[in-house]
Amino acid sequence: MGKIIGIDLGTTNSCVAVMDGDKARVIENAEGARTTPSIIAYTDNETLVGQPAKRQAITNPKNTLFAIKRLIGRRFESEEVQRDIKIMPFEITRADNGDAWVNVKGDKLAPPQISAEVLKKMKKTAEDFLGESVTEAVITVPAYFNDAQRQATIDAGKIAGLDVKRIINEPTAAALAFGLGSSKENQVIAVYDLGGGTFDISIIEIDNFDGEQTFEVLATGGNTHLGGEDFDNRVIDYIIDEFKKEQNIDLRNDAMALQRVKEAAEKAKIELSSAQSTEVNLPYITADATGPKHLALNITRAKLEALVEDLVASSIESLKAVLKDADKGVSEIHDIILVGGQTRMPLVQQKVAEFFGKEARKDVNPDEAVAIGAAVQGGVLKGDVKDVLLLDVTPLSLGIETMGGVMTTLIEKNTTIPTKKSQVFSTAEDNQSAVTIHVLQGERKRAADNKSLGQFNLEGINPAPRGMPQIEVTFDIDANGVINVSAKDKNTGKEQQIRIQASSGLSDEEIQQMVRDAEANADADRKFEEVVQARNQADGIAHATRKQIAEAGDALSVADKEKIEAAVAELETAAKGEDKAEIEAKIEAVIKASEPLMQAVQAKAQQAGGEQPQQSSAKDDGVVDAEFEEVKDNK
């Protein structure tokens, strides 16, 4: 059995780790980086993921997708999606099931299908490191993700060819990374996780007793639509508004210009974590009848902080609420862990320190802690990590709609999972033969104000006066936070149950089709790579052969020279096509035709008393591989 890898599927960046002995290790990707941008680009020939996708974003803005995690498991009509539609350069569209999907080159793609491309890159990164196939993973999600978002993340794993053994909350994973092996007893930590697109705060108690560590989540909260992207958007809006004041041109109408501004805004935000001011310079950003326009703007750290102070303040309000839910005071928190790239911002660090009255820990890598924790959980599931018990919670209350449009809660938020809870209900009318069980998730009293997870009917109830039949409704939440609901007529014994898949989401058939598409694309990608390698080999041989013809001079007969040059020309023509077999055949033809050339070059070298040159071979892998990598990355 292979390893269970840990994946932090982030909004902005993703990371993969694995247990290496008794420690978790972050794995570098093919580009040598420890994190991979969660960016996917669709070009005419291939699908790019990570840094190669990011590099071409400016010239391909409508087909370069980022921050897809903000769409996963969301309805198109939701307020969050409608807000994103206005600022994303790519097209967000309504799927037939009501979900938010993305339109790329005329094809509608589901967020899990897009996220699967990032997961496939993480999977391959791990496989290249381990030297074996990887089929199992622990994937992290924001603690405040609802059921639909968790299901969609599991779907993304399936499409990527991964058996998702566990979904684990990001702050809990960070706590595992921080606390594993610690000898301290009964410490309570706060994990403040402000990532690219989501914000979580969890209060976690770590106990050490008789050699066993218990990580118990006391309370969790947050906002699944607050993160670095929102900070970036404030800077983007400021830059665009200032340019509009000066030039009376709105750059929001130009997708390519908007992408350039986005990159500059992110860069400026990062620079202002260490500098007091930065210059945004974007020459030739646009043009009008009077000629090209250049964007030049100075942004100070004070200005950035003024633009985003309400976002930071809202995170502190969530912090207060979660501490109250955990029944803990500020003085009872031993350590504060900052997770997520946005926590590098000095204002964030300052406000968190002011709230707790102490500085956060500096020895936890905010970009890698979550993936490391996921790998630890993978080790626990595999049996490689022993004496560790993880007790997570459900982030939102769960219940059903009852008479009058009220939500009746069965499982309160911050209940430790896995858990099971039953409650008996009855009919609202005389002789009612069926009841509809409408499953809800949220904290509001009015059913319509909460998230609808789905509904089902229990039929065949015996006629009786209202209030007489006894309908037992049971909620069962597994360790992934995924919900099963059943309803049973205690009189007849009839039972109906469903695994909640929300009123939206992907059906099993759609997931299987996407898995097949992914496999087909993997085959197409492999063939494309083989063709590129063959082309590079052909180019190297053609170049070397022409050079040797020149070196041979008169030692090569005119007839042989013409024959070799004709073979090289045919090879160059074949290299422009897509047929790998033809390219390889033409390579062999050049090698065969070049035999008189090699003899002539060798004879000339012997006359000069020099060394015998080696024939340009189809096995000159060192040059070919390097050329291939460069071509692929810069596409």
Curated annotation (Swiss-Prot):
It holds the Pfam family HSP70. One of its GO terms (cellular component) is cytosol. The keyword Iron does not apply. GO terms for biological process: chaperone cofactor-dependent protein refolding; protein refolding. Induction: By stress conditions e.g. heat shock. One of its GO terms (molecular function) is ATP hydrolysis activity. SUPFAM superfamilies: Actin-like ATPase domain (SSF53067), Heat shock protein 70kD (HSP70), C-terminal subdomain (SSF100934), Heat shock protein 70kD (HSP70), peptide-binding domain (SSF100920). The keyword ATP-binding applies. Belongs to the heat shock protein 70 family. Acts as a chaperone. NCBIfam families: PRK00290.1, prok_dnaK. This is Chaperone protein DnaK. It comes from Haemophilus influenzae (strain ATCC 51907 / DSM 11121 / KW20 / Rd). The gene is dnaK.
